[in-house]
A protein has these predicted regions:
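Nucleotide phosphate-binding/pyrophosphate-handling subdomain across enzymes
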Residues: 1, 5-6, 19, 82-190
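Acidic, Mg2+-coordinating active-site environments of NTP-dependent enzymes
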Residues: 2-85, 99, 103-122
Length: 190
């Protein structure tokens, strides 16, 4: 499964999304399937080429099949294709896209002969836990922790603040490593 790529760990992976995609494509092995979080055409082309060269099925998450039904601090309800009223406790539109990637991976596994029930799928989504990602620790006052550490994560955090905390006074405490693009990160949060 190839998740959403961002300009992170560039000292190891490369300085462009295409270079990072090339490095990440190294995990694609013959005899397997690859699942891709859809991105820019140039990034997708890197994975398409790697899969073709290795004779690997490439499954791309179809975000157009994703419909958000409701969201609150209790979680989100969404539809994905023919699956309706799926529940996930993770917050934010980006987490729905991540869930779509998971469901795409499950579809690939089922096509490869794995036995995964609808109940297993729903339970897995409903019971997932990701500490430190827009996690509500306490109510009144609300205390939320988010360990995002790159501009892409901060963009998701900023959107979550707009979606879940609109019109409220917010105090933010941040810490960013010196090697991160903290200027862009703070501009995103402003």
């Amino acid at each position: 499964v190839i998740c959403n790529l961002g300009l992170d760990h560039t000292e190891f992976l490369g300085n462009t999304l295409e270079e990072i995609a090339q490095a990440k494509a190294g995990i694609i092995k013959p005899g397997c399937s690859a699942v891709l979080y859809r991105g820019s055409p140039s990034v997708e082309a890197v994975f398409e080429e790697a899969c073709k060269a290795r004779g690997v099925e490439l499954c791309k998450a179809d975000f157009s099949a994703l419909v958000s039904r409701s969201h609150s601090f209790a979680g989100q309800v969404f539809d994905f294709g023919s699956r309706k009223a799926l529940e996930i406790p993770l917050l934010g539109a980006h987490q729905l896209r991540n869930a779509a990637v998971v469901l795409t991976a499950v579809g690939c596994l089922i096509r490869r002969g794995w036995s995964i029930s609808e109940e297993n799928i729903r339970d897995g989504l409903r019971d997932v836990v990701w500490p430190g990602r827009f996690e509500l620790l306490r109510r009144n006052p609300d205390v939320i922790v988010d360990g995002g550490h790159n501009p892409q994560c901060l963009e998701a955090l900023a959107q979550n603040v707009r979606d879940y905390l609109a019109g409220r006074n917010i105090t933010a405490l941040t810490g960013v490593m010196a090697d991160k693009d903290y200027t862009h990160m703070y501009e995103t949060m402003a």
